[in-house]
């Protein structure tokens, strides 16, 4: 038993929770969480992958939108904001990578912990809402092309994007209260990805509200838009048109992101919180360990959207792909004399792409 207590102290597990995964305190009892080595290496490995690919992909995307995609269309505004949200998130990953390689001993202070969790949730729900905006924009362009001409302007997209940022920051602000650091019995510091036990019940209510209004409702809107888009593509004569191809890519990529990244995370986060609250009998301890381990897997999957979104810009945007190819060719031939002035070339490119794609181009 003494060896078990020493092992518990080294691993950050509460010693009184070791006996069969069950603890008997003065007034309450609860299951312990058996953390395996897999959990210490899985998340930092995923975060390293996301940081490298997400940093490069979103840097290129932001560079393209700022310097090579002018003038922007409405959908370009949404995609730029999506890339910006992803880029801000990947900048926070080095601290998390160090945290997990350091056996989850947080050394950066309480404020940085709160900011870390806040930015993660801002990226998570900001990405969901911007993907919803992109889907609604594409729906109106495909299903109601004439009625939507005035609604797809860049100015309206700027207003909607500003509203999205304000809404997300306001809704996620409570994370700054719920998250934070805590001291384990072995004196190491944890950075809560949810909250401490004392705030768990109110956090569960808050988490359910954000899940319903910031995930479930947007997901239903996206499914409705894509169902109507697919119906329109079937019945309209859009064979081999750029709009048809871009719409199909958009449907596939966004639904894949939701199925792989967002949906599993929200399901397992809710189940993990429920287990911490109510599944605290001796018979449920092994089940709770499995729920917690699976939840950690989905946390890694939830971060993958930051490196998958650049694929959306490339595959679902003919204009983005052409201008990226043109920009890379121009950078490799800077020493060659320009035959055409920059303004003439830009005018020609804009007229050509507008003729091919209209206002829904990207």
Swiss-Prot record:
Residue ranges crossing the lipid bilayer per the database entry: 41-63, 77-98, 115-136, 156-177, 204-226, 250-273, 293-314
Keyword tags: ATP-binding, Cell membrane, Disulfide bond, G-protein coupled receptor, Glycoprotein, Membrane, Nucleotide-binding, Receptor, Transducer, Transmembrane, Transmembrane helix
Gene Ontology terms: cellular component: cilium; plasma membrane
Keyword check for Transmembrane: yes
Cytoplasmic topological domain residue ranges: 64-76, 137-155, 227-249, 315-362
Main location, first listed in the record: membrane
Domain of life: Eukaryota
Coiled-coil boundaries: none
Membrane topology: Multi-pass membrane protein
Binding residues for ADP: 35, 192-194, 272-276, 292-295, 299
Cellular localization per UniProt: Cell membrane
Positions annotated with a glycan in the UniProt record: 11, 26, 102, 186
Extracellular side: 1-40, 99-114, 178-203, 274-292
Physiological role: Receptor for extracellular adenine nucleotides such as ADP. In platelets, binding to ADP leads to mobilization of intracellular calcium ions via activation of phospholipase C, a change in platelet shape, and ultimately platelet aggregation.
Family to which the UniProt record says this protein belongs: Belongs to the G-protein coupled receptor 1 family.
Entry protein name: P2Y purinoceptor 1
Species for this entry: Meleagris gallopavo
Gene giving rise to this polypeptide: P2RY1
């Amino acid at each position: 038993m003494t060896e078990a207590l020493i092992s518990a102290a080294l691993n950050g597990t509460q010693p009184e929770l070791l006996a069969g995964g069950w603890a008997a305190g003065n007034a309450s009892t609860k299951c312990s969480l058996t953390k395996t080595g897999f959990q210490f290496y899985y998340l930092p490995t995923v975060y390293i992958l996301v940081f490298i690919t997400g940093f490069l992909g979103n840097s290129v995307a932001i560079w393209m939108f700022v310097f090579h995609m002018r003038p922007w269309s409405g959908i370009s505004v949404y995609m730029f904001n999506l890339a910006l949200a992803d880029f801000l998130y990947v900048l926070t990953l080095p601290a998390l990578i160090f945290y997990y390689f350091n056996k989850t001993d947080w050394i950066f202070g309480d404020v940085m912990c709160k900011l870390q969790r806040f930015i993660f949730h801002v990226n998570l729900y900001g990405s969901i809402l911007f993907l919803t905006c992109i889907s609604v924009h594409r729906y109106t362009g495909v299903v109601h092309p004439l009625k939507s001409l005035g609604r797809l302007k860049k100015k309206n997209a700027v207003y909607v994007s500003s509203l999205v940022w304000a809404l997300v920051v306001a809704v996620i602000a409570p994370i700054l209260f719920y998250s934070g650091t805590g001291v384990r019995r072995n004196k190491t510091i944890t950075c809560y990805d949810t909250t401490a036990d004392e705030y768990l019940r109110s956090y569960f209510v808050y988490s359910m509200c954000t899940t319903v209004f910031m995930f479930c409702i947007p997901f239903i809107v996206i499914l409705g838009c894509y169902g109507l888009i697919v119906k329109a593509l079937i019945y309209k004569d859009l064979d081999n048109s750029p709009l048809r191809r871009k719409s199909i890519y958009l449907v596939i990529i966004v639904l894949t992101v939701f199925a792989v990244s967002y949906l599993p995370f929200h399901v397992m986060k809710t189940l993990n919180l429920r287990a911490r609250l109510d599944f605290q009998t001796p018979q449920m301890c092994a089940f709770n360990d499995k729920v917690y381990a699976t939840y950690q897997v989905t946390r890694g999957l939830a971060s993958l959207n930051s490196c998958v979104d650049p694929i959306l810009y490339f595959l679902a945007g003919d204009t983005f792909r052409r201008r990226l190819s043109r920009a890379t060719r121009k950078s490799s031939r800077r020493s060659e004399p320009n035959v055409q002035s920059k303004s003439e070339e830009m005018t020609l490119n804009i007229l050509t792409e507008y003729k091919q794609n209209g206002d829904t181009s990207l």
